[in-house]
């Protein structure tokens, strides 16, 4: 285009020189250079003095318009001037043109006219990068849509304490709406200002899903969501996105609408949620857990803060989703009088409490199956196999005995919440059933802290925690039992959680029995078989593959395995053997007891003072005995029966080092002495010359009032 203008200028200069020659025919001829300069000056005089400036429209930089009247130095690209010539000059210039010049001028004029006729077209986004700008891709359908405020450029300077937005702020505000393809919706119903989480209302599919629930006229299939017409979606596009006019937004909305029509409410799966951990359904063999509704506030109060933090809210939300339930609002599900609410949370116990409420049962829709005698016998057989690796107290069996005497045929629910499984848990010690002729022991709930105070440590160590956990599980009770017959309001709900007891409680609540006469004939046989099972259980309970310490046959071999003593306190005699044997028979000991340990403890108990378990001299004696064990192999053999109980199981077990074994022996001696001093003051007929029983503020063990113990034992009255 510029070449065409240069050709026109050359022609105009030539025409001007020809005109000047005609006007000065009477004057003498001069040098060619002088004639050229004179002609150029004359042409310059004929030109107007207006200076042309580029148009302000940057996209039409080939157009020019007149500017100011002043002559100012211009850039080389702006030296071109648009002038008007007389008709005589134009005709003269046309006469001097050659064929090539005419063709060039025609081509240039055609190009110029074509450029002028073309309208400015909208730039279509391409997948390639444009000049200095990154192309914005359409948003993915599975990513939440983000709304941008219309006055974003005005809000940014307010946050930066400025009155007007700067160029950087305007560019940033312009880039954000282009990235998200739309500005904030104007309609108030699209975004609820009172909603605590506005992201839900900003999602296109979620908005449409919320509207679907408001439809009152459903199709024949009530489980499928009602289809949305494209006309409604078209109106939704116009109302929700007034600024979304490009093709990318239209395509995104169409794809979203197609996906929305294919949604079905009855086929949505919880495990296919993007970005969330898949949770398994709760196991029916495990006890259901109820979660409090105000869990975030409860966590905040425990942390002494006014409001729950984001971490507390996330943790509370995860726990609720994990257990699939919140705390039941109905008070009838939980008994306020029961101190242990676990029995009411058991599925079978809840079913037993609902049996009395089922008065009107539709036989055609739902009917609980009657339990035949054969099924009851099979249940007893399974209990016989699985119950006696665990601890089943004699008080519980006596309660079962009392309940079974009033057995009548009954219904059982087809929904069995707890399945009888074997107790062969990996790397977990099996506890022997308690003997009714031995003392029942209660364990303090703060046993780790008591051990830490007695062993002079700031906090319980791992060995102390392991020992306390095992002892608590070994005796399986932390509080007194109010009576030998455990009822529904007992402190310990273990009996109600037993399968046989649950079945026995349900038998008394049965009201709808069809074959009453037939079952009554077989009732006596069922009860007789039940008593036979109890006798077999009593005989086999103490012969199971469970470690139980007995009186040694070879005292010398037992003494050789025990700890090494440096003084005569560990020397055994007939009195020590008698006390040691009685101590083994009086309790279900949690740890192995050696004769020399009994001899040392007997010396401590017979002191006139400083015999309390909390006394510093007692602690020093046991610590010195543990420090004297210098051989690792001997110490490991000494603690072999109790090694896993003290050091832990599996991957959580502590390494077998001399330091850990010494601490384990020290912890074991402190625990066993607390039990031994109780035994000595209970058996005053066997242990002579005892001082008054100490009354320390903290005890690890306590004898239950339900204990029978040795029938010939004598109980010493408590001392002040």
UniProtKB/Swiss-Prot annotation:
Q: Which organism is it from?
A: Plasmopara viticola (Downy mildew of grapevine)
Q: What is known of its domains?
A: The RxLR-dEER motif acts to carry the protein into the host cell cytoplasm through binding to cell surface phosphatidylinositol-3-phosphate.
Q: Where is this motif: RxLR-dEER?
A: 56-71
**Signal peptide location:** 1-20
What this protein is called in its record is: Secreted RxLR effector protein 138
Q: Does the keyword ATP-binding apply?
A: no
Family membership noted in the UniProt record:
Belongs to the RxLR effector family.
From the Swiss-Prot or TrEMBL record, state where the protein is found.
Secreted; Host nucleus
What is the protein's known function? Secreted effector that acts as an elicitor that induces cell death in host plant cells.
């Amino acid at each position: 285009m510029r070449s065409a203008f240069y050709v026109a200028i050359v022609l105009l200069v030539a025409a001007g020189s020809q005109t000047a020659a005609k006007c000065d025919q009477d004057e003498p001829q001069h040098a060619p250079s002088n004639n050229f300069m004179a002609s150029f000056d004359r042409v310059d005089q004929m030109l107007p003095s207006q200076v042309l400036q580029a148009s302000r429209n940057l996209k039409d930089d080939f157009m020019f318009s007149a500017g100011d009247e002043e002559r100012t130095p211009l850039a080389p690209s702006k030296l071109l001037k648009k002038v008007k010539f007389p008709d005589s000059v134009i005709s003269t210039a046309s006469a001097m043109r050659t064929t090539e010049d005419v063709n060039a001028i025609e081509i240039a004029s055609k190009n110029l006219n074509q450029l002028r006729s073309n309208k400015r077209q909208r730039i279509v986004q391409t997948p390639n990068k444009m000049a200095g700008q990154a192309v914005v891709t359409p948003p993915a359908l599975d990513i939440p849509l983000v709304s941008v405020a219309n006055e974003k450029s005005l809000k940014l300077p307010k946050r930066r304490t400025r009155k007007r937005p700067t160029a950087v702020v305007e560019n940033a505000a312009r880039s954000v709406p282009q990235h998200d393809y739309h500005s904030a919706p104007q309609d108030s119903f699209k975004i609820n200002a009172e909603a605590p989480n506005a992201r839900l209302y900003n999602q296109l599919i979620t908005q449409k899903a919320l509207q679907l629930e408001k439809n009152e006229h459903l199709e024949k299939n009530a489980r499928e969501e009602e289809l949305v017409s494209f006309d409604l979606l078209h109106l939704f596009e116009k109302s929700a996105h007034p600024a979304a006019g490009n093709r990318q937004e239209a395509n995104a909305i169409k794809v979203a609408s197609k996906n929305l029509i294919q949604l079905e409410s009855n086929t949505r799966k919880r495990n296919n949620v993007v970005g969330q951990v898949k949770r398994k359904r709760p196991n029916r063999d495990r006890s259901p857990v109820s979660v409090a509704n105000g869990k975030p506030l409860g966590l905040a109060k425990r942390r002494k803060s006014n409001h729950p933090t984001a971490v507390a809210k996330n943790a509370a939300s995860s726990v609720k989703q994990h257990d699939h339930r919140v705390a039941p609002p109905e008070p009838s599900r939980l008994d306020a009088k029961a101190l242990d609410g676990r029995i009411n949370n058991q599925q079978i116990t809840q079913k037993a409490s609902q049996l009395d409420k089922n008065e009107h049962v539709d036989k055609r829709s739902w009917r609980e199956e009657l339990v035949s005698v054969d099924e009851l016998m099979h249940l007893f057989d399974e209990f016989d196999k699985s119950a006696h690796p665990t601890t089943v107290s004699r008080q519980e069996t006596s309660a079962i005995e009392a309940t079974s005497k009033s057995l009548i045929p009954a219904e059982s629910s087809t929904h069995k919440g707890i399945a009888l499984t074997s107790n062969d848990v990996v790397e977990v010690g099996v506890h022997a059933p308690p003997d009714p002729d031995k003392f029942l022991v209660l364990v303090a709930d703060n046993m780790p802290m008591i051990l830490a105070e007695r062993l002079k440590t700031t906090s319980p160590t791992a060995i102390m925690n392991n020992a306390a956990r095992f002892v608590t599980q070994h005796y399986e009770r932390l509080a007194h039992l109010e009576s030998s017959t455990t009822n529904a309001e007992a402190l310990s709900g273990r009996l109600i959680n037993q399968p046989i007891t649950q079945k026995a409680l349900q038998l008394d609540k049965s009201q709808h029995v069809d074959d009453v006469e037939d079952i009554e004939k077989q009732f006596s046989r069922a009860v007789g078989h039940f008593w036979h099972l109890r006798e077999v259980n009593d005989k086999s309970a103490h012969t199971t593959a469970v470690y139980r310490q007995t009186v040694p046959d070879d005292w010398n071999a037992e003494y050789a395995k025990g700890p090494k003593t440096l003084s005569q306190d560990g020397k055994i005699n007939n009195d020590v053997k008698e006390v040691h044997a009685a101590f083994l028979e009086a309790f279900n000991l949690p740890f192995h007891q050696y004769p020399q340990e009994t001899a040392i403890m007997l010396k401590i108990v017979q002191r006139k003072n400083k015999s309390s378990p909390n006394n510093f001299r007692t602690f020093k004696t046991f610590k010195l005995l543990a420090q004297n064990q210098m051989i690792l192999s001997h110490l490991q053999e000494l603690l072999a029966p109790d090694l896993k109980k003290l050091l832990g199981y599996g991957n959580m077990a502590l390494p077998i080092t001399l330091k850990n074994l010494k601490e384990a022996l020290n912890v074991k001696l402190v625990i066993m002495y607390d039990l031994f001093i109780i035994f000595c003051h209970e058996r005053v007929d066997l242990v002579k010359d005892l001082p008054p029983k100490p009354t320390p503020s903290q005890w690890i063990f306590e004898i239950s009032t339900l204990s029978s113990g040795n029938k010939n034992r004598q109980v010493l009255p408590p001392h002040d």
